[in-house]
């Protein structure tokens, strides 16, 4: 019927059954309960683990009916089929990630360029997509605030609270397989991995300079815009970098 009666309380996305909703919720919490017995990699759902495990076994059960080429997953086969049908797919030239929808592709590209076209009219903060802006607006409206029991800090959704709470517990569930460093968030692990690979996927659209971390690109962009968002509460002096503000604060 196409009915999707189950709603994610974090982002409002709809699902046809509770099992898919539960898998989706892990994208907010960062939970990855399924572990590969061969390499130790973690996954949010069993189906992704099964596809990954075929990389170890060499199993490729999904065959193209046009040329009989085999793939480890149906999604890989479907992407390949477009080469026969002429259907469009959108590939990121920076990291190679493939998208079937232009809207998803455009949002992803902004993660590399640092472009944030959706601006909050209340405080001026910008975001790469409208859904992030809508979540942020809850800070101003006070909608559905959840509070940390340790320090009283408020959050718009529980996934942010769960990540914040690791500051108090010291939990760092994401481990680098190269050097063993532990991190509190998945995106921190992803950006840390670029240091080992030598990759710099975040590029300034003004001058072409590349960075391994998104916030380095954001701070760099202030040099072009002249913006100084980090302000000293003592004297009002503004800075383009948080580290410069911290160094300045010692003078007071």
Curated annotation (Swiss-Prot):
Instruction: Write out the entry's keywords from A to Z.
Output: DNA-binding, Metal-binding, Nucleus, Repeat, Transcription, Transcription regulation, Zinc, Zinc-finger
Provide the GO MF annotations for this entry. Answer: DNA-binding transcription activator activity, RNA polymerase II-specific; RNA polymerase II cis-regulatory region sequence-specific DNA binding; zinc ion binding
Where exactly are the zinc fingers annotated as C2H2-type? 6-28, 34-56, 62-84, 90-112, 118-140, 146-168, 174-196, 202-224, 230-252
Q: Which Gene3D superfamilies match?
A: Classic Zinc Finger
**Gene Ontology cellular component list:** nucleus
Q: InterPro entries in the record, alphabetically?
A: Znf_C2H2-type, Znf_C2H2_sf, Znf_C2H2_type
Q: Does the keyword Transferase apply?
A: no
Query: Which BP terms does GO give this entry?
Result: regulation of transcription by RNA polymerase II
- Cellular compartment(s): Nucleus
Chain's role: May be involved in transcriptional regulation.
Record family assignment: Belongs to the krueppel C2H2-type zinc-finger protein family.
Tell me what this protein is called: Gastrula zinc finger protein XlCGF28.1
